[in-house]
């Protein structure tokens, strides 16, 4: 049919003279290309956590993990120069959550779990590594930050209060030892 100004009508009327074909259930229906990528994004108020949970750590978080758990952050309440002071300072620099009153270094993993943090024995960049008192031969334990996970599984950490020196200092931990420690992710 002809529409306005002699152009073909974009919405022609149905042609009642044409033969119709009945629909069957054995056909296929193709909507074109299938979408690729993730269709569900996990929300997190902290943009760094949101990027990690939907990127690097996708499908690795524990069942029921709430990325918006209480952080316990009320500012750096740790004594200057202590390992806990550095861990708090560095996590804040990285934009990752950290509690203000997690206790001595050796207490951090349990304190963080109690607040809802994801804690396990697999290191990831930006994590707090927790050394128990027995692992460092003192009554307080120790904490540091995982700065890099190397291809061979070893890690590089930054830490403070090593041999009474403020720091921060860097050192490596061999791959065979990394799973002996607890790591606070976020």
Pin down the residues of each PLM region.
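Intrinsically disordered, low-complexity
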Residues: 1-93, 173-186
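Peptidoglycan cell-wall recognition and remodeling modules
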Residues: 62-186
């Amino acid at each position: 049919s002809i529409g306005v100004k002699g152009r073909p009508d974009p919405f022609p009327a149905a042609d009642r003279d044409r033969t119709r074909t009945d629909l069957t259930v054995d056909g296929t229906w193709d909507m074109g290309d299938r979408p690729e990528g993730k269709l569900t994004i996990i929300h997190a108020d902290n943009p760094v956590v949101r990027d990690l949970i939907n990127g690097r750590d996708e499908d690795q978080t524990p069942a029921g993990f709430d990325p918006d758990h209480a952080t316990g952050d009320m500012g750096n309440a740790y004594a200057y120069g202590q390992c806990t002071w550095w861990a708090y300072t560095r996590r804040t620099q990285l934009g990752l959550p950290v509690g203000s009153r997690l206790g001595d270094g050796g207490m951090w993993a349990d304190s963080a779990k109690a607040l809802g943090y994801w804690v396990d024995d697999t290191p990831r960049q930006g994590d707090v590594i927790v050394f128990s008192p027995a692992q460092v031969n003192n009554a307080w334990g120790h904490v540091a930050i995982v700065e890099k996970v190397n291809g061979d599984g070893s890690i590089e950490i930054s830490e403070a209060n090593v041999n009474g020196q403020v720091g921060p200092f860097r050192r490596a931990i061999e791959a065979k030892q990394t799973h002996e420690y607890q790591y606070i992710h976020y």
